[in-house]
Amino acid sequence: YAITGDERYRWLAEYFYHNDVIDPLKELRDDLGTKHTNTFIPKVIAEARNYELTQNETSKKLSEFFWHTMIDHHTFAPGCSSDKEHFFDPKKCSKHLTGYTGETCCTYNMLKLSRHLFCWTGDSSIADYYERALYNHILGQQDPETGMVTYFLPLLSGSHKLYSTKENSFWCCVGSGFE
């Protein structure tokens, strides 16, 4: 749609609208619960792009609401979010400092969403998050010797990073990490 302006493609994009994910965000409601984290972020990126193409204010507001909700309530100090790929009650954050904290795909996609929002607003807090997540998580998940990457950024005291291998592991986060 962005390239052609052909409404058929816009209709197709709307076909993928996920009511269970997007509708609570339209109501500015944090209904993330224990749902799969990276199921949400790409769908919100699509809403951000929808705003850019159609000037739909609802898409803009829900994108901004989601971003602030993530950063203010669901993000750890290095800029990562999730535990074992899922949201959790932010009031129980300390119970989610595990070896499976901080899925790289989530941070990578939050950086993509951040770029959209920063272009709209120029808000320096978005750039601050971007810098923190890029340097502490994205760059921090790369093995300095081999260049391989991690699936998670473990935050549990005493835990260690498990890096991908060149031949035997190709998780989703390997692709996001390299991208």
Which positions does each model-derived feature cover?
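Glycan-recognition and catalytic cores of secretory/periplasmic carbohydrate-active enzymes
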Residues: 1-179
